[in-house]
């Protein structure tokens, strides 16, 4: 039987035209974030499995791809299965985000980095998702992080840089939804949840759009029925205020929708942040969304997420995670990050289809000496043109149509008598 020739489920091949479109978008993102002072780094695709399963990744830890240790025996496998500790069979795992690797990177290289480090990472990550439209097992994230800055300057810089990047990509009608983990914790305390139950409650609230308030209550009722019922009432009370993506980022608007008695310190900080940001690019707006959670367990303060009407899910998000890096260093290090979900963004924006105005196809005579053909091609490439060779065939129209479909703008026929200069370039658009 023939071997499968399709990619693994949830993973994709990209043909040249699509790859070029993606690289164009990535170039826009790189240039924009670089202009805001972020330095690009690279980390391995795999990390120690214990680090990836340290309880900070939320539900994503359950989706991590793990790598078996070398040299395992059948007895090792049976013992692990019988004990239920199959993770002990693994020593590495593929990264499921870029934040956990960044924390390890900063802890490892702290002495070589500036006290406030602005990081840019653009790289694939892997999660064992159930593949569906817009959700893949391998996908690219574009992360910016500021490590070492405790003030709201970090959040303000991240939101400003991300808003400018969305604008540079031409993505309009974006809403940056904002919340704070401290407000969420205060809500859970107000409803009567013991602190030990907060992480589980946050995971359930994060699924609110999928399972509804009744589903959240059902998940949390065991051992905390009264608290779960109170939370269900609070969540239901939010709905009339969220039709526009949330409420204005002002203390007055936020307090109007929260239950009385919720700690207000974080609310004042959100209003201060909104004032600091000032006017964002046209097509990007800020809103407070009290049910925004962000599923990762490492967030400690302000959290944010990008919503767009053309996407059924968020197209980016992030927040403050002051406690993570301290796990590696034994001392607290403030950190905050923002990630653009590239796969969802690239489907929403208009990108150029062509190879560029300086792209040319040389349709060559098969009898032409190779050295002569390469000399002509090299001269054009040295002059800054993108050059492709295509053999002249009986069906010349098919050759030229293929070149036009690939985005090439012009062509020339070449043979042994063609001069190296003054090629007769013809526009493909006139065919």
Curated annotation (Swiss-Prot):
UniProt similarity note: Belongs to the class-II aminoacyl-tRNA synthetase family.
SUPFAM superfamilies reported for this sequence: Class II aaRS and biotin synthetases
Single GO MF descriptor: histidine-tRNA ligase activity
ATP-binding as UniProt keyword: yes
The protein's name: Histidine--tRNA ligase
Organism of derivation: Leifsonia xyli subsp. xyli (strain CTCB07)
Protein's GO biological process: histidyl-tRNA aminoacylation
Gene this protein is translated from: hisS
UniProt-listed Enzyme Commission number(s): 6.1.1.21
Principal location: cytoplasm
Entry GO CC: cytoplasm
């Amino acid at each position: 039987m023939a071997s499968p020739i399709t990619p693994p489920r949830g993973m994709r091949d990209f043909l040249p035209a699509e790859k070029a479109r993606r690289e164009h978008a990535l170039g826009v993102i790189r240039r924009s974030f670089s202009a805001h002072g972020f330095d690009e780094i690279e980390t391995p695709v795999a990390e120690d499995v214990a680090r990836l399963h340290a309880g900070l990744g939320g539900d994503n830890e359950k989706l991590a791809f793990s790598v078996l240790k070398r040299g395992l025996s059948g007895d090792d496998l049976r013992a692990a299965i019988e004990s239920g500790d199959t993770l002990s069979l693994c020593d590495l795992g593929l990264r499921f985000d870029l934040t956990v690797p960044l924390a390890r990177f900063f802890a490892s290289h702290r002495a070589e980095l500036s006290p406030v480090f602005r990081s840019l990472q653009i790289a694939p990550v892997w999660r064992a998702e159930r593949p569906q439209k817009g959700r893949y097992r391998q996908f690219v994230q574009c992360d910016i992080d500021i490590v070492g800055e405790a003030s709201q300057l970090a959040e303000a810089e991240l939101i400003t840089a991300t808003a400018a990047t969305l604008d540079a990509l031409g993505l309009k009608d974006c809403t940056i939804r904002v919340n704070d983990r401290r407000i969420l914790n205060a809500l859970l305390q107000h409803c009567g949840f013991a602190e030990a139950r907060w992480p589980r409650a946050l995971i359930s609230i994060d699924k609110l759009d999928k399972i509804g308030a009744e589903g959240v209550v059902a998940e949390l009722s065991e051992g905390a029925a009264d608290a779960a019922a109170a939370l269900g009432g609070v969540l239901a009370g939010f709905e009339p205020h969220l039709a526009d993506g949330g409420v204005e980022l002002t203390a007055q608007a936020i307090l109007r929708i929260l239950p009385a008695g919720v700690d207000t310190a974080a609310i004042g900080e959100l209003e201060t942040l909104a004032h600091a940001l000032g006017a964002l690019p046209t097509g990007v707006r800020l809103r407070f969304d009290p049910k925004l959670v962000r599923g990762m367990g490492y967030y400690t303060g302000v959290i944010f997420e990008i919503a767009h009407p053309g996407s059924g899910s968020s197209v980016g998000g992030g927040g403050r995670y002051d406690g993570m890096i301290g796990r590696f260093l034994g001392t607290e290090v403030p950190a905050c990050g923002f990630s653009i979900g590239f796969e969802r963004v690239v489907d929403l924006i208009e990108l150029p289809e062509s190879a560029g105005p300086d792209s040319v196809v040389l349709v060559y005579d098969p009898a032409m000496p190779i050295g002569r053909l390469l000399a002509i091609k090299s001269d054009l490439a040295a002059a800054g043109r993108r050059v492709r060779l295509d053999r002249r065939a009986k069906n010349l129209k098919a050759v030229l149509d293929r070149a036009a479909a690939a985005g090439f703008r012009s062509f020339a026929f070449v043979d042994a008598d063609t001069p190296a200069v003054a090629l007769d370039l013809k526009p493909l658009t006139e065919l």
